[in-house]
UniProtKB/Swiss-Prot annotation:
Entry membrane topology: Multi-pass membrane protein
A Gene Ontology cellular-component term: plasma membrane
Cofactor(s) named in the record: Mg(2+)
Subcellular location: Cell inner membrane
Protein name, as recorded: Phospho-N-acetylmuramoyl-pentapeptide-transferase
The species this protein was found in: Pseudomonas aeruginosa (strain ATCC 15692 / DSM 22644 / CIP 104116 / JCM 14847 / LMG 12228 / 1C / PRS 101 / PAO1)
Family: Belongs to the glycosyltransferase 4 family. MraY subfamily.
Annotated transmembrane regions: 25-45, 73-93, 97-117, 142-162, 167-187, 199-219, 236-256, 263-283, 288-308, 338-358
PANTHER family given in the database record: PHOSPHO-N-ACETYLMURAMOYL-PENTAPEPTIDE-TRANSFERASE (PTHR22926), PHOSPHO-N-ACETYLMURAMOYL-PENTAPEPTIDE-TRANSFERASE HOMOLOG (PTHR22926:SF5)
GO molecular function: metal ion binding; phospho-N-acetylmuramoyl-pentapeptide-transferase activity; UDP-N-acetylmuramoyl-L-alanyl-D-glutamyl-meso-2,6-diaminopimelyl-D-alanyl-D-alanine:undecaprenyl-phosphate transferase activity
Gene of this entry: mraY
NCBIfam families hit by this protein: mraY (TIGR00445)
Length: 360
């Protein structure tokens, strides 16, 4: 929006041409989203408290979590508001990738909002029935996948890239839609499963989003892409503005979500942010790198799958409780220790993901 204004004003003063630079708009985007989160956060927390929109807690969970009951939830709406405003202000709104990621994020956020709302109204932790949640996730995920497939301008946009193996490129064809669906929906649910402790999900999300922003910038620049032997996706660089907004909004939310949390993001935030990460990774053809950098999300998801499969097949549980962060809590780890150690793991995995840029 402001880019259009800057382009108009450039005819009167050439200095406005500086807004053409992605790096500047990325910096302004992160600062805008961060400021909005910090500014609106206290107001949103008070509003949620007044309306008694509090977290429902599982009775079979760790006993330490019973004290969290009633903590304001649905704070993810704050993150999405900051992301949307910052992106609309600083991104090039003629770029289709910006709209795809923003729309997918908000649609998955809508699913989470309905889920959270039902939890608040019914005063239990079940929320929206799983079949309906997965149905709408599938509708929106497939819709995004089909759109990206139909609007692909170059073959590389539907090719699977294997990091560290520069000669391995797999033409997916229509299977691109299938892969994209699983990446978007899988990422959405993985982040949601991780969101069980104060600040546990948001910080890894911020770190992965920041790294994906780097991939977006490099992939959108033909010279950098050729030098690093990564896919050149014209227009993908504009997504650095969205990624920066996510980083800023996430850090602003963490100010209130850090232990002991004043507010939880709820499904409205977790489902949306996970879908955003998945969609961005698909666009820049870095699905495998997302799998690496989001290793904490993968670990949380696998722990649930293993736990369910083991119990159904043998009647025994592998972990004391799933997702795995609860397993460590029941082993006696204090909540802050679990959180920070998972953050450290994410830092390492993100660095490994970034290292794939040179390991070719």
């Amino acid at each position: 929006m402001l880019l259009l204004l800057a382009e108009y004003l450039q005819q009167f003063y050439k200095g406005f041409g500086v807004f053409q630079y992605l790096t500047l708009r990325g910096i302004l985007s992160v600062l805008t989203a961060l400021s909005l989160s910090l500014w609106l956060g206290p107001w949103m927390i008070r509003t949620l408290q007044i309306r008694q929109i509090g977290q429902a807690v599982r009775n079979d969970g760790p006993q330490s979590h019973l004290s969290k009951k009633g903590t304001p939830t649905m704070g993810g709406a704050l993150i999405l508001t900051a992301i949307a405003i910052s992106t609309l202000l600083w991104a090039d709104l003629s770029n289709r990738y910006v709209w795809v990621v923003l729309v997918v994020t908000l649609l998955f956020g809508a699913i989470g909002w309905v889920d959270d709302y039902r939890k608040v109204i019914e005063k239990n932790s079940r929320g929206l029935p799983s079949r309906w949640k997965y149905f709408w996730q599938s509708v929106f995920g497939i819709g995004a996948a089909v759109f990206l497939y139909m609007t692909a301008e170059t073959p590389i946009e539907t090719t699977l890239i294997v990091p560290m193996l520069k000669s391995v490129e797999i033409q997916l064809g229509i299977f691109f839609v299938v892969l994209t669906y699983f990446v978007i929906v899988g990422s959405s649910n993985a982040v949601n499963l991780t969101d069980g402790l104060d600040g546990l999900a948001i910080m890894p999300t911020v770190m992965v989003a920041g790294a994906l922003g780097i991939f977006c910038y490099l992939s959108g620049n033909v010279k950098f892409a050729e030098y690093l032997l990564i896919p050149n996706v014209p227009g993908a660089g504009e997504l650095i503005v969205f990624c920066a907004a996510l980083v800023g909004a996430g850090l602003g939310f963490l100010w209130f979500n850090t232990y002991p949390a004043q507010v939880f993001m709820g499904d409205v935030g977790a489902l949306a942010l996970g879908a955003a990460l998945g969609t961005i990774a698909v666009i820049v053809r870095q699905e495998i790198v997302l799998f690496i950098m989001g290793g904490v999300f993968v670990m949380e998801t696998l722990s649930v799958m293993i736990q369910v499969a083991s119990f159904k097949l043998t009647g025994r549980r592998v972990f004391r409780m799933a997702p795995i962060h609860h397993h460590f809590e029941l082993k006696g780890w204090p909540e802050p220790r679990v959180i920070v150690r998972f953050w450290i793991i994410t830092v390492i995995l993100v660095l490994i993901g970034l290292a794939t840029l040179k390991l070719r």
